Amino acid sequence: TGNPPRQYSIPPKGATPLMDLRDFIDQGVWIISTIYNYLAYTGDYRILNEKTGYYDRVPGGVVLSKRVDSVLDHMIQVMDYLVTHIDENTGCLRAMYGDWNDALDGLGITHEKGKEYGDGVSVMATLQLYMNLREMKEILTKIDVHPELVALYSNKEEQIRQGIKKYAVVSNGTESRICHGWGEHRSYYVGTFNDVDGVNRYSSTSNAFYVISNMFKEGYVSKEDIVNVFKHLDSKYGIKTFEPYFKPDCKGVGRIVNLPKGTAENGATYIHGALFGTLALFMLNEGEMAYGQIEKLLPITHSILTTTPFVMPNSYSYNVEEDMDGQSMSDWYTGSANTLIKTLVKGSFGVFPSLDGLKIEIRDYFPSKSASLKV
C-alpha cells in the first residue's frame, strides 16, 4: 500500500516482527528523503535495484508477503500513497492519525459515519511531501525512467504550492506565519492568531519546514515574520513546539492536552523539533540565533541533568509550577544526535549534496575563527 509501519521490532530470524500500524501520514516522507540523501552522498544507484519484500496487514498484526519489489518500486508505492492522500479541496496532505508531533493526533478525526479519517491537514507533512516530490523527480530524471511520474509530481508540486499559499499562510494584517494545520472541513485551526481555543499560538515545525522545504523561496511569508515565530518560541532550553501550550479543555487537538504544560510535545523543547527550527534559522542566515539554539540544546551546557550527560536526550521540560527545570524524559535517543549532526553539516557548514554535485552555502556568521568538517 505504500504505508510503512510507524515502528517495528527486530525479531529473531524467521519470526514475525511486532509493528505499530497506526496511520501516521509522515511515515513515508522520511524514507524518501533518507534514500535521496544516501544517493547524493554515495552515488550508489545500485541500491534502487535491490530486491526487498513486504508485510501484509492482517487483523492483529502482519504476515510476510510473497511479493518482492525493488527499492525504487517501494519508493514509488510510498509516493502513490502520499499523493492520493492530498486533500483535493485544499491541495494539502491529510493528517490521518498524525505527523511527527504524534501527541497532536486530533486533526485527522472525522465525525462522518463510515470513514476512519477526515480531511484535516498536517502542514508540516505537506511541506515534507513537497520536498519529496522534488527529490523523486531528481532521482527518476537521473536514472531516466518514469517520465510520466516526473510530470505527475510536477503537477502535485504546483497543487501544494497553491494550497499552502491559500490555506496555510495566516495573517493578522501586520504579520504572517505558517499554521500547523486544521481539523475536519477547516472547522478549526492550530498555530494561528485565533486558534480553536481562542489564543494566538505559534507552532515550530510548520514554519521550520516552510524554510527547509524551500517553499520559503515562493515569498508567501517574509524572513522577518518567520524569525519572529522562532523568537516567540524561544525559551531557556531552546525552541519550543508550541507557545502557548494546550490546556486540558482544548478541543479537537488530541492527546496533547493530557500532557502537563512545558513537557514533551506540549510547549516544551523537543530536541528534534528545536533542531528543525535551528536548521531553518541557519538557512535564513540567522547564524547567531541558530548557534544560540545549539548551545541551549547541548546537554554539556546545562548545570543540572537528569539523564546521561554526554548523550542527546529527547526533550527538556520547563514548568515552574510543577518544579520542572530541564528534566528529560529519556536519553540515548540516537535520532536526536543524528538530527544534531545533520543540522551542523547543513546548517553550520552549509553543505548540501545533491544528485548532480555539492552546494555549499556561505554563512554570514560563525562563532569561532576556524572549524573543520570531514564527511
Predicted regions and their residues:
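Structured alpha-helical bundle/scaffold domains in large eukaryotic membrane-trafficking regulators
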Residues: 47-50, 145, 172, 356
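Acidic surface patches and DE-rich sequence motifs
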Residues: 87, 170-171, 354
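Catalytic cores of carbohydrate-active enzymes
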Residues: 6, 128-253, 295, 299-328
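Non-catalytic C-terminal accessory modules of carbohydrate-active enzymes
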Residues: 231-232, 263-265, 276-375
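Exposed alpha-helical structural elements
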Residues: 74-77, 221-228, 340, 361
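Carbohydrate-binding/catalytic loop surfaces
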Residues: 2-24, 55-66, 92-118, 173-203, ...
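Aromatic-rich carbohydrate-recognition surfaces in CAZymes
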Residues: 1-92, 122-126, 130, 267-290, ...
